[in-house]
């Protein structure tokens, strides 16, 4: 795969934002109060299940996360703390951006049209775009399980054929790209054990799997020199 052959990158939200870290930092203190505390994997599964249950009952990401906190507390048989639920609801808009993301998207924007693929529910897109140094050429916010029409509309609006876009997904279980496997895709594994830019995949033109966006930007530089 030659990443220089594409006109656009379809970046899923979790390639830019450490969503799982934000979720766990907000819910671990609650889980610790339970007689049967959940581990991180169980907390993330509970978050995803409750998000689906509440998605059509609330009108804003802040309200969704506040109610999600209260609902999880009830499931754990804990009296939900109002202030804590409000804090969790507000914190969702400030989940940490990966350290490499701002610089990487700034570099990649010089060579690609950038398309943001948002999760289906519970995300404040404006809070992310305000914290990045570049504007996205298009934003796809899936409204249901089949978000192909929204993607097709976004690509048409920026005059990029579907074959000209390279999807870039995270390793999260509910990454939006996981439901579309009918064309080549890049995966960011975010392997913190290896330094950025030194993984073999950054230097291997036959694969598209990187440890970070910085890794991918470095691979692009190598491809230009090849």
Give names to the regions the model predicted.
Residues 1-7, 11, 106, 117-226:
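Asp-based, Mg2+/Mn2+-dependent phosphohydrolase catalytic module
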Residues 2-99:
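N-terminal helical cap/lid subdomain that shapes the substrate entry/recognition surface
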Residues 31, 73, 108-109, 178:
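A generic structural signal for well-ordered alpha-helical segments
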Residues 34, 76, 110-112, 181:
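Helix C-cap/helix->beta junction micro-motif
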Residues 67-71, 104, 153:
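Amphipathic alpha-helical segments that form well-ordered structural scaffolds
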Residues 99-100, 149:
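Short, conserved clusters of charged catalytic residues that mark active-site
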Residues 100-111:
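Catalytic-core regions built around general acid/base machinery
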């Amino acid at each position: 795969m030659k990443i220089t052959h594409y006109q656009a990158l379809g970046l899923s939200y979790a390639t830019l934002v450490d969503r799982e870290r934000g979720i766990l930092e907000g819910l671990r203190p609650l889980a610790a109060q339970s007689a049967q505390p959940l581990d991180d994997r169980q907390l993330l599964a509970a978050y995803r299940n409750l998000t689906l249950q509440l998605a059509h009952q609330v009108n804003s990401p802040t309200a969704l996360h506040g109610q999600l906190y209260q609902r999880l507390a009830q499931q754990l048989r804990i009296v939900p703390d109002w202030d804590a639920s409000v804090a969790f609801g507000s914190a969702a808009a400030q989940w940490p951006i990966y350290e490499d993301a701002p610089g990487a998207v700034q570099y990649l924007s010089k060579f690609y049209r950038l398309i943001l693929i948002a999760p289906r529910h519970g995300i404040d897109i404006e809070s992310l775009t305000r914290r990045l140094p570049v504007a996205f050429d298009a934003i796809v916010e899936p409204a249901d399980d089949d978000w192909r029409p929204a993607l097709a509309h976004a690509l048409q609006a920026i005059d990029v054929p579907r074959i000209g876009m390279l999807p870039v997904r995270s390793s999260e279980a509910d990454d939006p790209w996981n439901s579309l496997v009918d064309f080549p895709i890049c995966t960011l594994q975010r392997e913190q054990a290896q330094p950025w830019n030194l993984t073999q995949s950054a230097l291997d033109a036959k694969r598209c799997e990187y440890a970070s966006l910085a890794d991918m930007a470095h691979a692009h530089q190598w491809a230009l020199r090849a």
